[in-house]
Amino acid sequence: ALKKMTRANFVAGIGGTNTPCFFASSSSDQVINNNSTTKLTFSNEVYDVGGVYNPSNYRFTPGFSGKSYISVNLWTEDGQSSIFRVDLWLYKNGNPTVTTQQRYTSSNTTVERQAAALNVTMEHDNNDYFEMYGLLRTVDSGSATMLVGSGNNALFDNYFTAFKIIE
């Protein structure tokens, strides 16, 4: 039998929560050496509903089987203005799964600051885990830095976040 369309009946048919969820940012500068795949450290938990992010090993373990939306941003700086490539990798259970790359067509074109972002929906089991890795290339083979501001400059330029997708 059909029910009368009321707000209560309508709302009862939809719902769920987008938790667990977390948002972590960098709490200190991190040096990334040239052409070296580096685990990105997001040790400042802004929030962690469900205790799914570990700020010691920088892992997201969802704790449920389903799908999560995962997002990361990497903002880097090289004082010598020699960055020509920035790669981001999402690792699942220790293996690279998704990548995004910001590259110039030639190492003759370089920048002082470069950002890369990765946004993806991932299917997982309750005990799968996710980590973020980055790689930078500079023309002078020097390192670059994942920067963290302070005071009025303390923006969330570098972050790792995820939330549950309601199905």
Label each region the model flagged.
Residues A1-G15:
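Short, surface-exposed terminal/edge motifs of secreted or surface/virion proteins that either
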Residues G15-E167:
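Extracellular jelly-roll beta-sandwich "head" domains, especially the C-terminal globular C1q domain
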